[in-house]
């Protein structure tokens, strides 16, 4: 028996939404629809739109029993006594369908058309040389993504799609049904690396130069900017500019040898070893800052431009002092924010006219810069947030499964990603990520609750299986041995991971090699107990940081601008077959919305924190390449400069 679309949940007065569902049922849509019987993991393809899900934003510590799942034939979830007390006291409420939800989440299945990796099976960021948790693409598939689309594919773009794209072009939000129409022919994650390579190889500079020569000086873009000023703004700018990258976006070097640790080509080819693992204690985070130091932005990787052309364009202006800010992107963001504050203070103290500093912040860099904006507002003249997320649940993939750097699987292991403090700053505060594909309910979890991590197994370092293993080993150890091991752990807590030391393994009576059936990336250096303590501290520290980023009406903020992507299908969450699927790590069935391939267009900073912005510039570039879109960056600077001028005129009128 097949599930039916929830047309009865759509408001009667919303004729378009109803008609859209009806049309999708009758037309030759390629959208897949799930059968209730998922025993073999197969999809029953129907010519229907997937059912919508919704509900109010809820994160609670009570759970309602999943009666619908029993009615639909699913086996009742089995939970042990340690599973949140049968998971009913700690799992956030599963939200029933609600047509009045202001932000309906959609469950969308895609066909195999488009430049998206259909073999992708886990969340990832798809950054350069990282997050490649999918099977190797065939040469034919790679060639297909590089070649232009055929005329038949362009025919698919009907009038309705163009209308939706125009709404996105005008930075207008689109409904869930419109997202279905726009992205129903896509599947999988966007290949941001390939997109960045292709954009880097395009002759944008030459094309823009020709356009500038032939352009009417009074001609305007669709969003009201004079085309001639898109070129002249680079000469209007004056003062100090600091540009910073995001997650994995700064060069890291060995403090002693000055050798490049991130990212060396040899490491990606498995020709050398790189150790980016941080210990579980606060002292370990302090120690690693003495051993590994940042050294500027990662401006490009081979042919992939990230910010090199932008910096070159800014440097061409003699009235600008452009500096890069590199930071250790593994650390807690409050540490990086303090380092940025120190740098900005040094620049500010040298200014004769205390105007402050312009900041261009890409991705996670926006989270760092925003903290400085809150704490030391006077240092900042303006910020351009480039694809900066207020949340990004994609991080759950690297934490749970690890990810690769080219052909190297040992750099970003499950343990390394778990102990990267910065990873947790992407966790969704609204708890939204997982959707039940059968009952059409949304599972909203408090991702800042350690019990959620343990029960759902969001990291193998703190899951129930490892807890049981630690408990069994503890029962086998003699009391004296336990005391010796505990003392040993205390003495070595701030230097090396105790459980990885051979002498400690001998004390524990474990002289055997690691069992062959244990994967190499699940042989952990840190004990279960230490991992849990670390998780509790880190979640609390992260939550406090994120809570400090909201708009303060009592402060006078400088002009803030946003450059973001809204043309690339972007993962919003995963459809799962019950909570057991989450425990088993079956994050393989995604639902999407417009974004830059990493950050959804509704997750953006600072907008989601209640901040007004002087402009919100939509770009067609992917996440990695957003700063290479010089036209969009020029628009952002124009808006900031004009806002400054208007502010000065306003103050002059007030004083007079």
From Swiss-Prot:
Location(s) in or outside the cell: Cytoplasm; Mitochondrion
SUPFAM superfamilies cross-referenced by the UniProt entry: alpha/beta-Hydrolases (SSF53474)
Entry's Gene Ontology molecular function annotations: O-acyltransferase activity
Pfam families: LCAT
GO CC entries: cytoplasm; mitochondrion
Superkingdom of the organism of origin: Eukaryota
Keywords: Cytoplasm, Mitochondrion, Phosphoprotein
Keyword Cell membrane: no
Example of a GO biological process term: lipid metabolic process
InterPro entries, per the entry: AB_hydrolase_fold, LACT/PDAT_acylTrfase
Amino acid composition bias (Low complexity), ranges on this chain: 22-36
Residue list for modification Phosphoserine: 39
Residue stretches of biased makeup (Basic and acidic residues): 62-78
Residues covered by region (Disordered): 1-41, 60-88
Additional remarks: Present with 1230 molecules/cell in log phase SD medium.
Protein name: Uncharacterized protein YJR098C
């Amino acid at each position: 028996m097949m599930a039916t679309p929830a047309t009865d949940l759509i408001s009667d007065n919303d004729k378009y939404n109803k008609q859209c569902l009806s049309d999708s049922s009758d037309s030759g849509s390629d959208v897949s629809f799930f059968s209730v019987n998922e025993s073999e993991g197969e999809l029953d393809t129907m010519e229907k739109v997937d059912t919508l899900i919704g509900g109010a934003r809820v994160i609670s510590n009570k759970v309602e029993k999943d009666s619908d799942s029993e009615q639909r034939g699913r086996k009742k979830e089995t939970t042990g006594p340690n599973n949140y007390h049968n998971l009913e006291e700690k799992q956030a409420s599963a939200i029933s369908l609600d047509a009045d939800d202001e932000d309906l989440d959609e469950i969308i299945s895609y066909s195999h058309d488009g430049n998206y990796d259909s073999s992708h099976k886990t969340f990832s960021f798809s950054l350069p040389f990282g997050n490649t948790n999918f099977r190797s693409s065939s040469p034919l598939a790679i060639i297909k993504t590089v070649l232009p689309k055929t005329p038949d594919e362009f025919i698919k773009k009907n009038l309705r799609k163009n209308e939706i794209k125009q709404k996105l072009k005008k930075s207008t939000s689109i409904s869930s049904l419109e997202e279905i129409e726009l992205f129903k022919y896509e599947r999988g994650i966007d290949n941001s690396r390939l997109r960045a390579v292709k954009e880097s190889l395009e002759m944008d500079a030459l094309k823009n130069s020709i356009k500038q020569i032939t352009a009417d000086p009074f001609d305007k873009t669709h969003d009201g900017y004079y085309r001639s000023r898109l070129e002249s703004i680079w000469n209007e700018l004056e003062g100090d500019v600091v540009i910073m990258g995001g997650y994995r976006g700064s060069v890291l070097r060995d403090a002693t040898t000055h050798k490049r640790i991130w990212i060396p080509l040899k490491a990606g080819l498995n020709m050398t070893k790189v150790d980016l693992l941080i210990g579980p204690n606060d002292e370990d985070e302090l120690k690693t800052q003495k051993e590994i130091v940042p050294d500027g932005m990662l401006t490009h990787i081979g042919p992939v431009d990230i910010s090199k052309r932008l910096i070159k364009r800014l440097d061409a202006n003699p009235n600008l002092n452009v500096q890069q800010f590199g930071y250790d992107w593994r650390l807690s963001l409050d540490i990086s924010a303090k380092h940025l504050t120190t740098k900005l203070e040094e620049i500010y103290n040298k200014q004769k006219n205390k105007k402050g500093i312009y900041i261009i912040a890409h991705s996670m860099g926006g989270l760092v810069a925003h903290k400085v904006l809150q704490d030391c507002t006077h240092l900042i003249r303006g910020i351009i947030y480039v694809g900066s997320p207020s949340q990004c649940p994609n991080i759950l993939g690297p934490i749970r499964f690890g990810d690769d750097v080219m052909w190297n699987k040992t750099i970003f292991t499950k343990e390394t990603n778990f102990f990267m403090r910065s990873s947790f700053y992407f966790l969704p505060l609204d708890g939204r990520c997982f959707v039940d594909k059968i009952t059409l309910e949304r599972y909203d979890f408090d991702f800042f609750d350690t019990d959620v991590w343990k029960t759902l197994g969001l990291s193998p370092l703190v899951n129930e299986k490892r807890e049981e293993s630690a408990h069994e080993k503890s029962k086998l150890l003699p009391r004296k041995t336990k005391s010796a091991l505990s003392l040993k752990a205390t003495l070595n807590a701030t230097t090396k991971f105790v459980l990885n030391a051979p002498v400690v393994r001998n004390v524990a009576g474990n002289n055997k090699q690691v069992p062959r059936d244990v994967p190499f990336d699940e042989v952990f250096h840190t004990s279960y107990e230490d991992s849990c303590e670390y998780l509790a501290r880190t979640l609390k520290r992260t939550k406090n940081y994120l809570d400090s980023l909201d708009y303060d009406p009592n402060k006078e903020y400088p002009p803030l601008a946003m450059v973001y992507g809204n043309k690339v299908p972007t993962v919003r969450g995963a459809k799962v077959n019950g909570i057991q699927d989450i425990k088993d790590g079956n994050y393989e069935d995604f639902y999407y919305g417009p974004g830059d391939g990493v950050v959804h267009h509704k997750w953006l900073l600072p907008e989601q924190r209640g901040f007004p912005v002087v402009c919100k510039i939509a770009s067609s570039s992917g996440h990695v390449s957003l700063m290479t879109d010089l036209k969009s960056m020029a628009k952002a600077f124009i808006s900031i400069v004009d806002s400054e001028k208007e502010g000065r005129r306003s103050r002059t009128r007030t004083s007079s």
